[in-house]
């Protein structure tokens, strides 16, 4: 029984919050994904953290997002790879918050139309992929690959990182980890382990990643500190 209700006080019921994420493949990997995002949210000082729903493929993630949106009893966001660099007209710029629905609406393989009632901020990108986020934090890479990382093989961790293609990122990672004990980057084995160590302040330098953290409610003092 709610004591506040007995005293005549208004009862505030907080909506459930869901983040539908592209990724995962099996129960163990799904658990790693949820843990990595929860750690990222904690480090970013996000108080009201959404529950992470691991949706595997991007099409399933979009469908899950639409279904939760239709139910109307929760706050929901969709986080997917942009897969490709975002066109200039849809990019984040001064005076323009970016147009993610235009990107997936015209992208071959998606052709997603913005669902009724969905806002621009409910669609978030790992631009162009999760590997962008991983490469942004050299220290996180070192914690997983331990030694032998060739940082000079990796692209600059600044804003231009979000303009690199998936092929560029994969090639750079392959070259950078060649002399580590793992010898190669394996998305299933490594990606969420690295993400668990990624610093929100490093992500804050990337416009689309910063947009995501801001929408999730990141604390400014946690993400804007120099590193």
Model-derived segments and spans:
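Acidic, divalent-metal-binding catalytic cores of TOPRIM
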Residues: 1-227
């Amino acid at each position: 029984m709610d004591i506040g209700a007995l005293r005549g006080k208004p009862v505030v019921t907080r909506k459930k919050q869901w983040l539908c994420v592209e990724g995962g493949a099996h129960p163990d990997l799904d658990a790693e994904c949820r843990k990595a995002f929860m750690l990222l949210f904690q480090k970013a000082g996000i108080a009201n953290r959404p529950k992470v729903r691991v949706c595997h493929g991007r099409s399933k993630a979009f469908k899950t997002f639409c279904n939760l949106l239709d139910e109307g009893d929760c706050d929901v966001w969709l986080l997917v790879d942009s897969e490709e660099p975002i066109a200039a007209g849809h990019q984040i710029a001064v005076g323009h918050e970016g147009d993610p629905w235009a990107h997936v609406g015209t992208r071959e393989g998606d052709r997603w139309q913005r669902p009724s009632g969905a806002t621009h901020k409910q669609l978030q990108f790992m631009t162009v992929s999760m590997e962008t986020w991983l490469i942004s934090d050299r220290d996180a890479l070192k914690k997983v690959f331990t030694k032998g990382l060739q940082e000079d093989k990796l692209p600059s961790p600044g804003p231009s990182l979000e303009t690199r293609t998936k092929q560029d990122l994969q090639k750079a990672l392959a070259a950078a980890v060649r002399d580590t004990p793992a010898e190669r980057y394996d998305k299933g084995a490594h990606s969420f382990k690295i993400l668990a160590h990624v610093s929100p302040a490093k992500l804050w330098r990337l416009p689309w990643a910063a947009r995501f953290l801001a929408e999730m409610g990141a604390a400014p003092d946690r993400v804007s500190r120099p590193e």
